[in-house]
Amino acid sequence: YMQYDAENNNYSCTSVIFKSWKDDPIDSKGGVRCGKVIGKDKNQLSKAELDNQRDTKCYRLIYGLLSMDCTTADGQPTSIEDVPILWRVTGTNFKPVGESLKSLKSRGNLMQNHFLNLTSNRRKSGDTVWYVSKIAIDNKTVKFTKKDLETMDLFTDLITDENKRVSDAYHKANDKKETDKITAKVIDNLEDDPATILAS
């Protein structure tokens, strides 16, 4: 999960990278899912709260190697091969990617042993244009090499580092919340009867 702050043009909150929906995606602000409300709980929200929810999205993260024919900024044809990438998908691209990975798993195949051939379909609504991924799985099995293992280890290290960063921020935010509660309690007591507090 990531929460976008349009005013500052950055992500103000991120959750840990999790593998299962059963995991608890703690976030950098000391909460869960960057405040995203899911399921039936959405019915309890006001319109303003629902509008705020649009800034928080769940992303599917795909780590892999990219090979493609492409064009440079000045229009020259070129190509790249086996470049390590992180592909972040959400919205209309979330489901197609998930379905492709699920179909591999249901056949007993591992993602790292197959090429995923990507194209996109252009969509337009009014002035808004976006692209939806179209994924075709190459049924040919690709050999998993020592170099691939090194790249996978690199991805694992990146995930571990990111999750540690978010976890540290989560605990720090919760420690601050606890300190703020204690401070608020002391202030409340002072407001109730300062003479009693100062005499003790």
Regions found by a protein language model. Give the residues of each.
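OB-fold ssDNA-binding interfaces and closely related basic DNA-contact patches used
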Residues: Y1-S79, S125, K176, K181-T183, ...
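Intrinsic disorder/low-structure terminal segments
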Residues: Q3, N10, I17-S20, N93, ...
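Extended serine/threonine-enriched, polar tracts that run as long, contiguous segments within proteins
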Residues: K57-T141
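Glycine- and charge-rich intrinsically disordered segments
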Residues: K146-S200
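Detector for Asparagine
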Residues: N8-N10, N43, N52, N93, ...
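Low-complexity, intrinsically disordered regions enriched in charged/polar residues
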Residues: Y11, G39, V83, G91-G98, ...
